[in-house]
Design a protein with these regions (language model features):
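Bacterial N-terminal signal peptides
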Residues: 9-19
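N-terminal cationic amphipathic segment used for targeting or macromolecule association
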Residues: 6, 20-24
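Short intrinsically disordered, low-complexity coil segments enriched in acidic
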Residues: 2-3, 18, 569-570
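Bacterial N-terminal signal peptides that target proteins for export
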Residues: 1-11
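Extracellular/surface-associated beta-sandwich interaction domains
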Residues: 24-571
């Protein structure tokens, strides 16, 4: 039997807008006793932290699995030199069913109830295991900047072919370059490859002395759009696999009995002007946060990164996760989410909502001024957004799924409007049509109501001329109340986390459109009209979030916000 480990890549953006899942604050800082006991001889909670600080944001990143939080207070400062924070805490939630129909969940919040994640890579020997010494060794971050790599590469001497490196300037190599965590410990059955690096000679060994370097795509050679544009007409774009997933080069692969599958180098390479890289897992100890009896066997390579720019990107931070299933079983009905607790200055006067078209969750002030409190924002209060803009790759179907549905286009705009996108023989050029997609929003939702093509609304890589590279955007936006006993309150066990991942309340009830989404007596609540996106305002012009039971018109015609629900601005 051939065993493989599968990979998923996720990319999240966090941005502050001046002038995933949301949570509140009543129990923050209150230590609760875990119902499930961690084992002392196994991994302890990660103690490491680092700071993303290259632009106008100063954000704490923890090795324990969450971020923006130091165990008691918020550490996401915008502006970086101020004392106001826009975020409180965030972490990954992942859950699915194994072949025996057993639920497996890995999720974390503040860590007050316990832990589900620990530092370090897992083994690739079909056991997906880790011990305390490995967790402790990897309880740290690796911080690098694009500028120091560019400076190092600028000192290379090349052969006549202008490609082969024949000399380097060692004085240009920083400690971060010299000590890059490119490899796991194969003697301990870890993967041969961990942090991405550019391999000059293809020998599968990180040798900075020979011109290898932490892999920023400096030339754009991995960019799918660039590669596609340079291919001969009719050619198929084939993405470059990661070293682990590259089974053609005998120097690559995991170095263990469990092969890797599905990883793409364009997703794995380093991003940003400043990058924090680290690796963590869900097998280091008992899951005392989610209380999941069954761990998954996930190895997660993470990046936190940011850019220095003169525009809004200077107020943004980004997060990329390469999620690898090191176990030998396949999870089905699997869901991924970024759990986020935003506190915009003063935590007691906030609202949340989402923009379905943009795939964006956001938090905004419920009053004209923020506060009171020393951490409140002065003047016109800002808003903060969280964009889950590159989710998991969708299952392949052999198509370049369209961004614009031509049948819906003809119904709304008429066939003649398509003529501008036809080639000399009358065929529609999907790339040209995609380039103008924002002119034709009514045609984003397919006339067939195909659930796959509908994901083009806020997914990415639709109609780009490349087959099977489509990725999910935001498919749910939910919140829960700060009540550990209510059915729309805080999660307490694995089934609660899994229900929230699927857009279902703790008691299994579907979220409904309007009001608070749960209670029939709340203002605007519409029983039986199920909703995937809570508080979308008027952004779901297609009624996509209510289409599962044929109620598209509700989302198109009835605004839904925390204000229309009669909620009070709070945490």
């Amino acid at each position: 039997m051939k065993y493989i480990s599968s990979k998923v890549s996720l990319l999240l953006m966090c941005l502050l807008l001046v002038g995933g899942i949301a949570q509140a604050e009543a129990v923050k800082g209150v230590k609760q006793k875990p119902a499930k006991k961690a084992e002392l001889e196994r991994c302890r909670r990660g103690q490491g932290s680092a700071e993303l600080n290259i632009n106008n944001v100063r954000a704490r990143i923890n090795t324990s699995g969450n971020m923006w939080y130091d165990g008691s207070t918020a550490r996401y400062f915008v502006p970086k030199d101020g004392n106001s924070t826009a975020m409180y805490c965030a972490a990954l939630w992942i859950g699915g069913m194994d072949a025996n129909d057993q639920l497996r969940v890995a999720a974390l919040r503040f860590g007050q109830d316990g832990d589900d994640f620990w530092p370090g890579p897992l083994t690739v020997d079909r056991n997906a295991s880790i011990d305390k010494s490995v967790c402790e060794k990897w309880d740290k971050h690796f911080i690098i900047t694009r500028a120091e790599v560019e400076y190092f590469v600028a000192g290379f001497e090349y052969a006549a072919d202008n490609k082969t490196v024949i000399g380097i300037d060692a004085s240009r190599a920083t400690d971060a370059i010299k000590n890059w965590p490119a490899h796991g410990d194969v003697s301990k059955n870890q993967s041969k490859f961990l942090a991405p690096f550019f391999d000059q000679n293809g020998n599968g060994v990180y040798e900075w002395e020979a011109g290898d370097y932490p892999y920023y795509d400096l030339s754009g050679e991995l960019c799918p759009a660039k590669i596609k544009a340079e291919l001969p007409a009719g050619s198929t774009y084939t993405p470059t696999p990661t070293f682990e997933s590259n089974l053609e080069n005998p120097n690559y692969g995991t170095g263990g009995s469990l092969e890797a599958y599905g990883g793409l180098l364009v997703d794995q390479v380093l991003k940003g002007d400043q990058t924090i890289w680290w690796v963590f897992n869900d097998k280091g100890n008992a899951h005392t946060e989610s209380k999941s009896e069954n761990p998954i066997g996930l190895e997660i390579r993470a990046q936190a990164f940011a850019f220095t720019m003169s525009d809004e990107i200077n107020n943004m931070t980004f997060y990329s996760y390469e999620i690898i299933n090191r176990s030998t079983f396949v999870l089905t009905n699997t869901y991924f989410s970024q759990w986020v607790d935003p506190d915009l200055g003063c935590a007691a006067d906030d609202f949340v909502g989402c923009d379905v078209e943009r795939g964006l969750g956001y938090c905004y002030n419920g009053k004209a001024t923020d506060g009171p409190g020393t951490g409140a924002y002065a003047g016109n209060p800002p808003a903060i957004g969280i964009d889950f803009f590159q989710g998991p790759y969708m299952d392949p179907d052999g198509r370049d799924n369209p961004k614009v549905d031509t049948n819906a286009f003809i119904d709304f705009y008429g066939a003649a409007a398509l003529d501008a996108y036809r080639d000399s023989v009358g065929n529609i050029n999907p790339i040209l049509l995609t380039d103008d997609a924002y002119k034709w929003k009514n045609a984003w939702y397919p006339k067939s109501k195909d659930p796959i093509d509908a994901c083009a609304i806020n997914g990415v890589n639709f109609g780009n001329g490349i087959v099977d590279d489509e990725r999910f955007g935001m498919r749910r936006f939910i919140y829960y109340n700060n009540d550990g006993t209510a059915n729309n309150g805080e999660p307490d066990k694995a089934t609660d986390y899994y229900n929230y991942l699927r857009g279902i309340w703790r008691d299994g009830k579907r979220m409904c459109y309007g009001g608070d989404g749960y209670n029939a007596g709340s203002a605007g609540y519409q029983e039986g009209i199920y909703s995937d996106f809570m508080f979308p305002g008027t952004s779901d012009i297609w009624g996509w979030g209510t289409a599962s039971n044929g109620n598209e018109d509700v989302g198109k015609t009835t605004p839904w916000t925390e204000q229309t629900a009669g909620n009070s601005a709070d945490d």
